[in-house]
Design a protein with these regions (language model features):
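N-terminal secretory signal peptides that target proteins for export/translocation
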Residues: 1-10
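Tryptophan (W) side chains
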Residues: 12-14
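Soluble non-transmembrane domains of integral membrane proteins
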Residues: 30-222
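Flexible extramembrane loops and terminal tails that flank transmembrane helices
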Residues: 208-211, 230, 357
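Channel- or pocket-lining gating/hinge segments that regulate access to a cavity or pore
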Residues: 219-347
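Juxtamembrane boundary at the C-terminal end of a transmembrane helix
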Residues: 357-364
Length: 364
């Protein structure tokens, strides 16, 4: 019995020591800084983001590599302090800023559309005497963005940064912006970008769905860019328009005398077949250089379709009229002659008119 009571008391002492150790550890742990509730809920975080430098745009990967400056501003009355002579604000940078942020409430805001880890990140923190806080974060990273090639090469795209609040729903922390935040986001947009012209900056709200039907505050900061279409004319559109002449020339090169065609259909078929292989090679080259053009309907795919249609129509004309003389057998050689003359003049108008119309639709 004595052994059992000793074992029982030892077990209780062991459990008590574990409890005291856990209690001591939790008592010394620092609680997480609470939300600044002096202004009520939600805590409004003024947000601005500018593209400071755009290194490259990869349309095939649908991404861009850029350096962005994210500015967050909010008020925390607990951080107010008596104004010192000659100092407008307290300034912290890099490691000092991170150490100061560890002791205060900071909104959990992240750039959600980055790809991989940032190659560079730094912080700058300013605290004003009235409790106003301004946090500036510079980040260099690759950003996922969407590209719509439907109006290529007259298209406009948007380089976007997705700013999201984590951990708190939009009823507790809300991202917002005013005109000065939009002006900050638009600053630096006059910088040059190879093959693109920079345009306006837009900010839009779009809440992000969370667990249990909660919504998290989210802003999209979008920089509009317009493609310089002259860069795509020489490698893509000049060959496409030139290849349209192949089936037209194959039909036009024949001549008719007294209702009879003078050039062998076999020679003209060789021209069309050669043009077909040329268009296939051009199609393969364009899709290799611009894979995104083959994934959607756009001006380039329509012009390729027009090329294939013109080649097929030319081959049908050569076989039906030049090789087998089907119209002559059915309606006579003079009807066939007039039909051929009509095709010689109508086909170029239809083909080239359609090609120009496709370009005008993309430009509209």
């Amino acid at each position: 019995m004595m052994k059992k009571s000793a074992l029982h008391s030892r077990r209780w002492r062991w459990l008590l020591s574990i409890f005291l150790a856990l209690h001591g550890a939790t008592s010394f742990a620092e609680p997480a800084p609470a939300l600044p509730l002096a202004g009520g809920l939600p805590v409004v975080v003024r947000t601005g983001l500018r593209f400071d430098q755009i290194d490259s745009i990869d349309e095939n990967e649908r991404s861009c590599t850029a350096t962005v400056d994210l500015r967050l501003r909010w008020r925390d009355a607990r951080l107010a302090y008596p104004k010192e002579d000659g100092a407008l604000f307290q300034n912290f940078k890099d490691a000092a800023a991170e150490a100061r942020m560890a002791t205060m409430w900071v909104p959990r805001v992240e750039l959600a559309n980055t790809i991989g880890s940032p190659t560079f990140r730094t912080f700058s923190l300013r605290i004003y005497p009235d409790g106003q806080v301004e946090l500036m974060q510079r980040t260099s990273s690759k950003f996922a963005t969407s590209f719509d090639p439907q109006r290529f090469p007259f298209d406009q795209q948007k380089l976007a940064a997705e700013v999201v609040v984590r951990g708190d729903d939009q009823d507790r922390v809300a991202l917002d912006y005013h005109q000065d935040d939009l002006d900050f986001s638009a600053s630096g947009s006059d910088r040059k970008l190879d093959r693109w012209a920079l345009g306006l900056t837009n900010i839009r709200r779009e809440p992000l769905s969370g667990l249990y039907d909660t919504l998290h505050s989210r802003l999209w900061i979008e920089l509009q860019i317009r493609r310089q279409f002259t860069m795509a004319m020489a490698p893509i559109f000049i060959p496409l328009f030139a290849s349209l002449l192949i089936p037209l020339m194959a039909v036009y090169m024949n001549r008719v005398e007294d209702g009879e065609f003078q050039i062998d259909a076999f020679e003209l078929c060789n021209i069309v077949i050669g043009g077909l292989f040329a268009v296939i090679a051009l199609n393969f080259t364009v899709n290799s250089a611009y894979p995104m053009l083959g994934d959607a309907d756009n001006t380039v795919t329509r012009l390729f379709g027009l090329n294939y249609l013109a080649l097929g129509a030319a081959l049908a004309i050569i076989i039906a009229l030049f090789r087998f003389n089907l119209v002559q057998r059915a309606l006579g050689k003079y009807v066939q002659e007039q039909l051929y003359l009509s095709i010689v003049w109508a086909a170029p108008l239809l083909v080239l008119g359609t090609a120009i119309a496709l370009l005008l639709v993309a430009m509209a």
